[in-house]
């Protein structure tokens, strides 16, 4: 179990992460829609995840959402360590009714986010969909992964977001799987 805390003038966040868990989640970010999405990541990634955030949501949700991505990324990079023996690459397609998303990632050590989604609404309830990219950018920058997210089809914005987060959890699950035939670092360079 990896534990990471991050405190700024805007947020106070604690994350506990077990990559090889059972999909148990205890999420309290102060942003209900984000709680729902992170629960999907834990359940579909089969990781145990506890997140507590006290943020300045009286201003808006931006600082909390971005900083949770950062803190989760910091926990993830610690949890995967040197990546020895891991598959390294992961991908998943996830449908939900009319929506279909694909997430592909590489535990490359090279932070890069390519997000291709045209949400059909700017808000999901009180949640600004622009914050989804802020979450993933924070995660990518600190988890040191390359992440491609494509919403291939979708009409309902909630479904679009949910397929993205479910596919993200499933792609992580594949990438961190131990490959019994891979003895060393999964790179011709010898390091990631």
Swiss-Prot record:
- SUPFAM superfamilies from the entry? Ribosomal protein S5 domain 2-like
For this UniProt entry, what's an example GO CC term?
cytoplasm
Q: A biological process (GO) annotation for this entry? A: L-histidine biosynthetic process
Q: Which residues form a coiled coil?
A: none
Q: Where in the cell is it found?
A: Cytoplasm
The record's keywords, sorted A to Z, are: Amino-acid biosynthesis, Cytoplasm, Histidine biosynthesis, Lyase
Can the keyword Amino-acid biosynthesis be found in this entry's annotation?
yes
Query: Which residues span the membrane?
Result: none
SS bonds (residue pairs): none
Q: What is its main location?
A: cytoplasm
UniProt GO molecular function: imidazoleglycerol-phosphate dehydratase activity
Under catalytic activity, the entry for this protein gives: D-erythro-1-(imidazol-4-yl)glycerol 3-phosphate = 3-(imidazol-4-yl)-2-oxopropyl phosphate + H2O
User: Which InterPro entries does this chain map to?
Assistant: IGPD_sf, ImidazoleglycerolP_deHydtase, ImidazoleglycerP_deHydtase_CS, Ribosomal_Su5_D2-typ_SF
| Annotated pathway | Amino-acid biosynthesis; L-histidine biosynthesis; L-histidine from 5-phospho-alpha-D-ribose 1-diphosphate: step 6/9
Q: Which Enzyme Commission numbers does its entry carry?
A: 4.2.1.19
| Pfam families xref list | IGPD
Record carries keyword Zinc: no
Q: Which NCBIfam families match?
A: PRK00951.1-1, PRK00951.2-1, PRK00951.2-4
Give the protein family.
Belongs to the imidazoleglycerol-phosphate dehydratase family.
> What PANTHER family does the record point to?
IMIDAZOLEGLYCEROL-PHOSPHATE DEHYDRATASE (PTHR23133:SF2), IMIDAZOLEGLYCEROL-PHOSPHATE DEHYDRATASE HIS7 (PTHR23133)
Q: What is this protein called?
A: Imidazoleglycerol-phosphate dehydratase
């Amino acid at each position: 179990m990896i534990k990471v805390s991050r405190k700024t003038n805007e947020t106070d966040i604690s994350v506990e992460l077990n990559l090889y868990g059972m999909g148990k989640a205890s999420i309290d970010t102060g942003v209900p829609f984000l709680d729902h999405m992170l629960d999907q990541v834990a359940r579909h990634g089969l990781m145990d995840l506890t997140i507590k955030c006290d943020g300045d949501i009286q201003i808006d949700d931006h600082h909390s959402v971005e900083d949770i991505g950062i803190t989760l990324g910091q926990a993830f990079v610690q949890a995967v360590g040197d990546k020895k023996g891991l598959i390294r690459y992961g991908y998943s397609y996830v449908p939900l009714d009319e929506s279909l998303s694909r997430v592909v990632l590489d535990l490359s050590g090279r932070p890069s986010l390519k997000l291709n989604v045209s949400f059909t609404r700017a808000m999901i309830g009180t949640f600004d969909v622009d914050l989804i990219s802020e979450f993933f950018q924070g995660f990518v920058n600190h988890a040191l992964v390359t992440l491609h997210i494509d919403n291939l089809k979708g009409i309902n914005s909630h479904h679009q977001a949910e397929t993205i987060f479910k596919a993200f959890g499933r792609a992580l699950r594949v990438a961190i799987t131990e490959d019994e035939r891979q003895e060393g670092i999964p790179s011709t360079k010898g390091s990631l």
